[in-house]
Amino acid sequence: MLDPKHLRENFESVEQRLATRGGAVTLDRFRELDSRRRELLREAESLKAVRNAASEEISRIKDKSQAQPRIAEMREVSAKIKVLDDDLRGVDDDLQAVLLTIPNIPHQSVPVGASEADNREVRKWGEPPRFGFTPRPHWEIGEGLGILDFERGAKLTGARFTLYRGAGARLERALINFMLDLHTEKHGYEETLPPFMVNRESMTGTGQLPKFEEDLFHLDGTDYYLIPTAEVPVTNIHRGEILKGSDLPLSYTAYTPCFRKEAGSYGKDVRGLIRQHQFNKVELVKFTHPSTSYAELERLLANAEEVLRQLGLHYRVVELCTGDMGFSAAKTYDIEVWLPAQDTYREISSCSNFEDFQARRASIRFREDDKAKPEFAHTLNGSGLAVGRTLVAILENYQQEDGTVVIPEVLRPYMGGCSSIGR
């Protein structure tokens, strides 16, 4: 959520910057409600000043019978104040609802653009593998090895669900454990295991609600939603809290399954693991001081990149343009891994700085010291990594002509020493 004071005082510049995101971002309703709110406040405060002065005047009148007309007059003033206060509460509610629909302001360093075609490549690491044969897509490899069962996954639930079997299930588990070990033991994150369902307040805190309700799985008759990402529960760990400035940055990692309806993706990635209703992900979340949040974003990005480097997978980092960024982000880097069968890069991690946007929605603050005024923290997160897509990248990049798949060396201790997957 944007700071209403900053929005009010910098209305035109904020509106211009938000316009670079594309879409119908209008601030007219905010300006209308904010003006009405200030008008009501002025009226209410003026009447309260009159009432306070009258109260002092009445207290000085010794003959209380002479004070009755003034008391009756003040009853009318109090009734008007109550009406104004009620109106003000209604306007405050409407203003809050409007603020929840306004996206974050892109950081000045973010390139202006309309779509992913305008994203800026930052760097590449490694080289694509060279094959002496035509590389097969991961779904063919997985089915051929008997480790991915798409038909039975669909039978059990429906489209975009997969049954992992044997070495496929073990490889998924190996990746989760490898990522968590790397982030906790080397990068210094605290491991958490949050609930996989959260309430509406948590979804609102990170920005999924109210805008993206159609993409969420809601449990009928409850206030609970299945999480679309561990970002939601982990960021909300400190919702409504005041942290110690000396404790920042706080760095958390979590493995969770993620659940998404994938509304609007009909016909996209209909085969394989790229776009599923349920998938596993290891998430990285940071709570930082505003002055260090962009340095921490670079550190978080490097932590996510190291997963791919240790796995020996070629990738690139791109900086998203204003028109391709998520609703809550001020700046985002995507890490895209190379998939040889598709002859393209695919997103495997998105690393973002939200500045104080989520912290305002979730009331996450910190104090520099015991006497300091609380300030809003900055929140960051990124995938470290999407597990299913990492498995896809391993199957496609480490495939052999005979249909087997070599297991990256760093994963072999997690696979019981196994060096390859065969039929």
UniProtKB/Swiss-Prot annotation:
Keyword Signal recorded: no
EC number: 6.1.1.11
Leader sequence segment: none
GO molecular function: ATP binding; serine-tRNA ligase activity
Gene Ontology terms describing biological process: selenocysteine biosynthetic process; seryl-tRNA aminoacylation
Enzyme class: ligase
Binding annotation for L-serine: T229, A230, E231, E283, S383
Alphabetically ordered keywords of this record: Aminoacyl-tRNA synthetase, ATP-binding, Cytoplasm, Ligase, Nucleotide-binding, Protein biosynthesis
Compartments where located: Cytoplasm
Pathway terms, separated by semicolons: Aminoacyl-tRNA biosynthesis; selenocysteinyl-tRNA(Sec) biosynthesis; L-seryl-tRNA(Sec) from L-serine and tRNA(Sec): step 1/1
GO cellular component terms listed in the entry, alphabetical order: cytoplasm
Coiled coil stretches, renumbered: none
Database matches in InterPro entries: aa-tRNA-synt_IIb, aa-tRNA-synth_II, aa-tRNA-synth_II/BPL/LPL, Ser-tRNA-ligase_type_1, Ser-tRNA-synth_1_N, SerRS_1_N_sf, SerRS_core, tRNA-bd_arm
Subunit structure comment from the entry: Homodimer. The tRNA molecule binds across the dimer.
Record's function text: Catalyzes the attachment of serine to tRNA(Ser). Is also able to aminoacylate tRNA(Sec) with serine, to form the misacylated tRNA L-seryl-tRNA(Sec), which will be further converted into selenocysteinyl-tRNA(Sec).
Domain description: Consists of two distinct domains, a catalytic core and a N-terminal extension that is involved in tRNA binding.
Name listed for the protein in its UniProt record: Serine--tRNA ligase
Organism of origin: Geobacter metallireducens (strain ATCC 53774 / DSM 7210 / GS-15)
Taxonomic lineage from the root: Bacteria, Pseudomonadati, Thermodesulfobacteriota, Desulfuromonadia, Geobacterales
Protein encoded by which gene: serS
